[in-house]
Amino acid sequence: SSSSGFPTDSKIYGGLGWLAGPVLVFGRGRYALDRRRTPLADDGIINTIGVDLPDTEISVKDVFGLDTDMTVPAFKKRTEYVPEIDPSYCFDHDTTIAILASFAHSRKLMVQGYHGTGKSTHIEQVAARLNWPLIRVNLDSHISRIDLIGKDAIVLKDGKQITEFREGILPWAIQHPVALVFDEYDAGRPDVMFVIQRVLEADGKMTLLDQNKVIHTHGGFRLFATANTVGLGDTTGLYHGTQQINQAQMDRWNLVATLNYLPHEKEVEIVLSKAPSYNNKAGKETVSSMVRVADLSRAGFMAGDISTVMSPRTVITWAENSVIFGDVAVGYRMTFLNKCDELERSTVAEYYQRCFGEELPEYKTVASTAA
């Protein structure tokens, strides 16, 4: 057995791979719990997490550095379902407060914002510091109603093949102290969204029709979602595959936080935390210029000059690639410029020239070449 009390030799198989740990397998169309080997909670529900309800409280000011007297419930024990802590992570004040309120008061929270702004990572890093088990499910077009609820499966028991119901990720999660995060929430299929809608109710009970069973929500269950749009469809052309969300369902989310592009200095701080080799006077000036390029790309996108926008994730990748290639210009071309439409590349190259005071070699003007 592992240190958490879980059997490490369980023979459980899934479609795409392990979701977390040796007990739960999450794959496309298949979920399995080894019911013969997992410990039972006091109420008879199989507990594969290793913890029950939060057993301590933490100070938000001490742990997150936010100017508030708020305290939040947390777990003393750290299990394998808890995300790893990123000690250099920079928290956005409003988004972090919303996430902490969701954990403290069981509020269902959707975090909306542009790509690469750290929506899912914010939730993960808050959960990591609370020792709160967390599972992320990507609502791509292959996630179906059966995946979420479960299905009958043929299993081998006492040497005989029998049909047994295997729970999906949703009924499993709501019976455990888990933060369940639905990524790409606005890309979910309509039939999948209506499965989730019942769990969004105030009492959060879920009925399994195949089992004639009503599942009650565990006191430690929390529900989150991340989305690029706010359920009204995509008007930017950036997010193909997203769709409008039923407004009756949107109304059930208790909180909606918006995490878009951050102030210049805050974004510089985040990039420096991820690329510490730039943490010197010259490096800080370089990173500040990188963020200015990103600011220009966003202004150009809003004005309709370009159709590709540079996210904070892109800036971090640019900084990392520049270290690899030893050249900021090469890093820019490899990270962002080559992703842009050919007709827009001269404009994107001009952003670089305006911020760094030099032109990219392949985009030098005739005048500058003559000079």
Put a short name on every predicted segment.
Residues R37-T79, T96, P263-H264, L272-A371:
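Alpha-helical lid/collar subdomain of P-loop NTPases
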Residues Y31, L148-L156, A179, F224-V230, ...:
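Hydrophobic transmembrane alpha-helix bundles
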Residues G17, G27-G29, R37-K284, R292:
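AAA+ P-loop NTPase catalytic core and its hallmark functional loops
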Residues S4-L19, V23-R35:
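Charged low-complexity interaction tracts in eukaryotic proteins
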Residues P7, A227, M310:
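Single, functionally critical "micro-switch" positions that shape active/binding sites
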Residues G14, Q125, T317:
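DNA-binding alpha-helical recognition surfaces that contact promoter or target DNA
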